[in-house]
C-alpha cells in the first residue's frame, strides 16, 4: 500500500475529475504560456494523500515548487502547521472516512433493508389481500424513505462543514495575500480513502472591497439582521484550563494531596467548552477579510466539485454562471436565507 502523496513528475497531482462548467484546471506541472494569465478560480495544483496510512503528511514542498511555476511565492512554512493540524488529526481523518460517499451509500443500503424488513413484518399483522401487491407496496415505501435519506445527505454536503471546511480558516487567512485559497475534498480509490487538498488561484481584493462596503451598509440600515447572521457563525471549542487559576493560596493548601501520586499515573487535563465567534465585531474591512478566510475552504470545495449555485451574473469571475466568493457570502451567509448553512 503506497503511503506517499500521489504526485506526477512535475509536482502536481495526478489526473482528477474536474468537470466544473465554465472553468478548467491549468495543466499541472506546466508553466504558463506566453501572455497567459491566471484567472480567478483556476486550480493550481492538488495534493493527494492516502487517509488509511499513519502517519501521513502533505508534500507541501512539491506544492510550493508547483506554485512557483506560476510566479506565486508562498513558503510552505507559512501554512504547513495550519493545514496539517486542521486536516490530519486522527479524529478529523476518521470523520472524513465516515462522511465519505461510500459510507453514506452503505448506510443508505442498511437503512433500506431495515426499513423494508420492519414494514414487511408489520404488514403481516394485517390482511393485505394479494401477497405480491403487499410486497410491492412495502418496496415502494422503503424506496421512497431511502431516497428521502439520500436527498438529505446530498443537501447536507452542500453546506459549510465545520469539521473540514472551516478548519482551514487559519491557513486561508495566511494565504489570502498570496491570492491562493485552500479547499479539501475526499474520494475513494479501491479500498483507500484519499484526501485531496486543492490550491486555487483567486484575486480577492475586489471581493473584500465589496464585502466591506456591504457590511458597512448593513451596519447602518440592517444592523439587527447582521448581528443575527453573525451570531450563527460560531463553533464550540475545547480549551484546557488550569485547576489553580481561580484558587487562592488557602484553597491550594486544602486541595494538596497528602500522598504522592503513583508512579506512571497521568491525570487527564481539565477541559472546558466555549462558544467562539468566527467573525467578531470589528471594522468592516477586517470583518470582510475574516469572512473570506472562514468560507474560503467552503467556496473552494463547492467550486472544484461543481456544486456552486448557478448565478445569473457574476461580479469577479470570468464565467457568467459561477458566483464569486462575495456573491456566495452575500446571498447565503449575510442574506435572508432561512436554511442553515453550517453543518455541525
Swiss-Prot record:
GO cellular component, one term: plasma membrane
InterPro entries in the cross-refs: DUF4481 (IPR028054)
Record's bilayer topology term: Multi-pass membrane protein
Pfam families, per database record: DUF4481
Localization: Cell membrane
Region: Disordered, residue numbers: 1-31, 244-266
Keywords: Cell membrane, Membrane, Transmembrane, Transmembrane helix
The organism's place on the tree of life at top rank: Eukaryota
Listed transmembrane segments: 106-126, 133-153
PANTHER family: TRANSMEMBRANE PROTEIN 268, TRANSMEMBRANE PROTEIN C9ORF91
Functional summary from the UniProt entry: Stabilizes cell surface expression of ITGAM and participates in the adhesion and migration of phagocytes during bacterial clearance.
Record-given protein name: Transmembrane protein 268
Protein source organism: Bos taurus (Bovine)
Amino acid at each position: 500500500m503506497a503511503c506517499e502523496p500521489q504526485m506526477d513528475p512535475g509536482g502536481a497531482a495526478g489526473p482528477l475529475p474536474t468537470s466544473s462548467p465554465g472553468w478548467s484546471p491549468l495543466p499541472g506541472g506546466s508553466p504558463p504560456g506566453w501572455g497567459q494569465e491566471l484567472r480567478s478560480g483556476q486550480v493550481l495544483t492538488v495534493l493527494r494523500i492516502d487517509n488509511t496510512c499513519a502517519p501521513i503528511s502533505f508534500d507541501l514542498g512539491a506544492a510550493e515548487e508547483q506554485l512557483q511555476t506560476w510566479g506565486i511565492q508562498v513558503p510552505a512554512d507559512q501554512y504547513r502547521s495550519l493545514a496539517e493540524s486542521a486536516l490530519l488529526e486522527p479524529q478529523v481523518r476518521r470523520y472524513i472516512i465516515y462522511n465519505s460517499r461510500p459510507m453514506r451509500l452503505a448506510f443508505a443500503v442498511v437503512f433500506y433493508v431495515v426499513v423494508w424488513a420492519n414494514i414487511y413484518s408489520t404488514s403481516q399483522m394485517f390482511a393485505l389481500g394479494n401477497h405480491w401487491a403487499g410486497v410491492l407496496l412495502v418496496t415502494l415505501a422503503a424506496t421512497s424513505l431511502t431516497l428521502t435519506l439520500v436527498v438529505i445527505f446530498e443537501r447536507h454536503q452542500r453546506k459549510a462543514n465545520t469539521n473540514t471546511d472551516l478548519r482551514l480558516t487559519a491557513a486561508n487567512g495566511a494565504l489570502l495575500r498570496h491570492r491562493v485559497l485552500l479547499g479539501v475534498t475526499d474520494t475513494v480509490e479501491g479500498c483507500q480513502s484519499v484526501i485531496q487538498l486543492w490550491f486555487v488561484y483567486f484575486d480577492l481584493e475586489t471581493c473584500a472591497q465589496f464585502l466591506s462596503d456591504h457590511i458597512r451598509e448593513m451596519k447602518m440600515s440592517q444592523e439587527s439582521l447582521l448581528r443575527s447572521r453573525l451570531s450563527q457563525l460560531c463553533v464550540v471549542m475545547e480549551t484546557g484550563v488550569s485547576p489553580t487559576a481561580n484558587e487562592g493560596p488557602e484553597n491550594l493548601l486544602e486541595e494538596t494531596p497528602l500522598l504522592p501520586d503513583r508512579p506512571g499515573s497521568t491525570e487527564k487535563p481539565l477541559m472546558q467548552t466555549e462558544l467562539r465567534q468566527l467573525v467578531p465585531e470589528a471594522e468592516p474591512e477586517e470583518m470582510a477579510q475574516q469572512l473570506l478566510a472562514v468560507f474560503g475552504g467552503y467556496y473552494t470545495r463547492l467550486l472544484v466539485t461543481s456544486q456552486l449555485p448557478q448565478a445569473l451574473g457574476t461580479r469577479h469571475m470570468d464565467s457568467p454562471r459561477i458566483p464569486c466568493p462575495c456573491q456566495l457570502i452575500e446571498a447565503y451567509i449575510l442574506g435572508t436565507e432561512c436554511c442553515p448553512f453550517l453543518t455541525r
